[in-house]
């Protein structure tokens, strides 16, 4: 009974964070969903591509249930892995998000069909023999981590935060409130830095 509860709980969280991840692209231009927003090139549509490959492998191939569409291999092909993190001009947003949703359906079928202790094999892990529980936790963690990245990227673009439409202004706080909050945090950070510098300068050297 507890095993079934654990599987349903983890699966429910995965479904929720997937939708939040896709929502991060809503309302943005083609340029904004694709453009690099960090020095290493992190971008919103690339995160979707990466998570598609993650689920296709971990909740498909690992349990002998391969996703029927081509996905990049994780066998040391750096070029393929790099291409998995961004979208070319020939790849449409609808195509990439559509494939992600199809992977969801494939993953959901795997989760529904297998017991939480069903065995799998992840050859690139130090302990390659795993259970569905290990892999489900890993995929949930990976998706949540990248949803956090997406949250920051989206806020940088247009100030939108949260996990669904309306979250950004649900507390009734406007831009002036957040600018005041940011200024207060900046003031505190500078004050702490100044105090630390002064303390260091006044320290007696041995």
PLM regions: where:
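Short, contiguous alpha-helical
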Residues: 7, 11-25, 30-80, 122-189, ...
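Intrinsically disordered, low-complexity terminal tails and inter-domain linkers enriched
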Residues: 194-204
